[in-house]
Amino acid sequence: QQGVDVLVINPVQTTSAQTIVDTVSPSGTPIVFINREPEESVLDSYKGKCCYVGADARQSGTYQGELILETETQGDINGDGKVTYIMCKGDPENIDAQYRTEYSIKALTDAGKAVECLYEYLDNWDQTTAQQDVANALAQYGEKIEVVFCNNDAMALGALQSIQQAGRTAVSYTHLTL
């Protein structure tokens, strides 16, 4: 009879991570969470037997903001002293989406930039949904939109399609500064 040496788990919702730990911990089986980072308290509750392996979404978000700062206008295309943006967000319960959203803007504000969010869209990692939402945003806000932030590449591709269809030019495809 074979047992389990370790569980490798890619949680759909990180809010379920504590339940997973509580269920598995009596057996003493180690747990490795991948792709979606559970709260630190979850990892601490099964110390030495539980870890996360994956990208640091805080760093990913910070990098997005830093890329904006590297452009000629630093995201302030109209020169009014404020970066206006829309945000295409992934799953609201996904900590990676939360961190990417927070830290992309934090990079701008930490650099002294004033920011204004025109709208946040819940696109759940979906290219088609992001494409529709960005098309709607461009119709509603037009030239006010200077930056489009997306929590993942699929949504960014959808956003880019709408930007191009609206006759706008993306200054950089890495972060969709318009």
What are these regions (language model features)?
Residues Q1-V4, Q131-E143:
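Short, well-structured alpha-helical segments in soluble
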Residues I20-Q59, D80-T84:
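Flexible loop/hinge segments that line or gate small-molecule binding clefts
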Residues V6, P11, C50-Y52, V83-E93:
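Short beta-strand segments enriched in small/hydrophobic residues
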Residues G3-P11, P30-I34, M87, G142-N152, ...:
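Periplasmic-binding protein-like
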Residues T174-L178:
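Conserved small/polar residues in nucleotide/adenosyl-binding loops
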Residues Y52-K82, A130-Q131:
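Hydrophobic alpha-helical segments within soluble ligand-binding/sensing domains
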Residues S60-L67, I95-A114, T129, D133, ...:
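Short, solvent-exposed amphipathic alpha-helices that sit
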Residues A111-N124:
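Short beta-strand elements in bilobed, periplasmic/extracellular small-molecule ligand-binding domains
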